[in-house]
Amino acid sequence: MARSDEDTWDLASSVGATATMVAAARAVASRGPDTLIDDPYADALVRAVGVEYFVKLLDGEITLEADNAAMLAVMTDVMAVRTRFFDDFFLSSGLPQAVILASGLDARTYRLPWPSGSVVYEIDQPEVIEFKTRTLADLGASPAAELRTVAIDLRDDWPRALRDRGFDPTAPTAWIAEGLLIYLPPDAQDRLFDNITALSAPGSRLATEFHPDAGARIGASSQRMAEEWRRHGLDLDMADLFYDGERNPVVDYLRERGWEVEARSRPDMFAHYGRPFPTGEAVEALRQSLAVTATRR
């Protein structure tokens, strides 16, 4: 189903299901002796959501055609590298105030070694926030920093809701927008960064990712995966969840608004973490992605 301005979701449908998919990839990527990440909560969160395909994937009960199996392996590596990039961003920022935008099933507030006195704000739709908070509590997990949830759609007045939860715009803040931009209309992407800029004191830091030509390239590969998923009973076409339209390049947009920006290609990120980047036409869309970090002047 195509997106609309008023659409909503839980963790088993629409954009929410992609959060569960990412958590499943994190769970798989956390296994084995040579892992880049350690997410001890991802497996349990995916099982709690209960999407049969993702549970079977965790249990090794899904047999994919060769091309799609290879793509799944690539995507697992992509999620491992991406997760590690954002983990390292928070760990290196040294800032006691952090915001996770569209937090989904992200468990960083629970699993990272936050400095004493850290406050982490997680923003997502109310049903998503409630589910993750309750499930992790049922697992006996406790946040490693002070957690303040902000249950609101990012298309609404989230800056006000964030301040109402105690956010201090005069304090430098570490922000992440992971796996988010492609699900926003181009104008909403600009508003997101405008709001972040308005809320960021000098010294604030931001990490995100940008996919040039995202809709066309990634949409085509997503449709191939959607056909395979339907064979296994999962009705999810990620191409329907993306917003088309020309976007302002994130690097230029942030620089014009007072940020010092660095960007690294996905192959460079793979090399940085000691992983070979795959070759072939199927991964060309992934090759174009940029890992972006910025510091507010």
From Swiss-Prot:
Per UniProt, where does S-adenosyl-L-methionine bind? 124, 153-154
**Gene Ontology molecular function terms on file:** methyltransferase activity
Query: EC number(s) on record?
Result: 2.1.1.-
What Pfam family is a match, any one? LCM
Alphabetically sorted, this entry's keywords are:
Methyltransferase, S-adenosyl-L-methionine, Transferase
Q: Name one GO biological process term.
A: methylation
Q: What is the designated name of this protein?
A: Putative S-adenosyl-L-methionine-dependent methyltransferase Mkms_1060
What species is this protein from? Mycobacterium sp. (strain KMS)
Kindly list the organism's lineage. Answer: Bacteria, Bacillati, Actinomycetota, Actinomycetes, Mycobacteriales
